[in-house]
C-alpha cells in the first residue's frame, strides 16, 4: 500500500511519471483528482470537516507529515475544508512521492 512507503529524494534530474503510471497510482487512491495548473500536473483533494478547528488540526497533521517526508504540498485551509495539492516542484510534475503522500494524508482521516 502506498501509505506504507517512504518518499525518496527527488532532484531536478528525476524523471516524472508517465500518464499511464499516474493513472495506475491514482487508481490506488480514493477521491484524488489529477489536475493541471499552469501546465503542471498535480494531485488534489478536498477534505471536509464539521468546523474550522477540525480543518485546522488536519492541516497541522499534514504539515507534520510533510516535514517527516521532506515533501511539501500546497494546503488551502477554509472553514470546514482543507484542499491539499501535491506535485514535485523540482521536476514540475508528478513523482511517486506525490502519490505516497496523498495516501498518507488519507490515512490521517
From Swiss-Prot:
Entry's Gene Ontology molecular function annotations: 4-alpha-hydroxytetrahydrobiopterin dehydratase activity
Disulfide bonds: none
Catalytic activity: (4aS,6R)-4a-hydroxy-L-erythro-5,6,7,8-tetrahydrobiopterin = (6R)-L-erythro-6,7-dihydrobiopterin + H2O
Pfam families: Pterin_4a (PF01329)
SUPFAM superfamilies: PCD-like
Entries under Gene3D superfamilies matching the protein: Transcriptional coactivator/pterin dehydratase
Biological process terms in GO annotation: tetrahydrobiopterin biosynthetic process
Keywords: Lyase
InterPro entries, alphabetized: PCD_sf, Pterin-4-alpha-carb_dehyd, Pterin_deHydtase
EC number, as in UniProt: 4.2.1.96
NCBIfam families, per database record: PRK00823.1-1
Family designation: Belongs to the pterin-4-alpha-carbinolamine dehydratase family.
Record protein name field: Putative pterin-4-alpha-carbinolamine dehydratase
Organism field: Vibrio cholerae serotype O1 (strain ATCC 39541 / Classical Ogawa 395 / O395)
Amino acid at each position: 500500500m502506498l501509505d506504507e512507503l517512504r518518499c525518496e529524494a527527488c532532484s531536478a534530474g528525476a524523471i516524472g511519471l508517465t500518464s499511464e503510471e499516474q493513472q495506475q497510482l491514482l487508481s490506488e487512491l480514493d477521491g484524488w483528482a489529477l489536475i493541471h495548473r499552469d501546465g503542471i500536473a498535480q494531485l488534489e483533494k478536498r477534505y471536509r470537516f464539521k468546523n474550522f478547528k477540525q480543518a485546522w488540526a488536519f492541516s497541522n497533521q499534514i504539515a507534520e507529515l510533510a516535514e517527516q517526508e521532506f515533501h511539501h504540498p500546497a494546503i488551502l485551509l477554509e472553514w470546514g475544508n482543507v484542499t491539499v495539492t501535491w506535485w514535485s516542484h523540482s521536476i514540475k510534475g508528478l513523482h511517486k512521492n506525490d502519490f505516497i503522500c496523498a495516501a498518507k494524508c488519507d490515512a490521517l482521516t
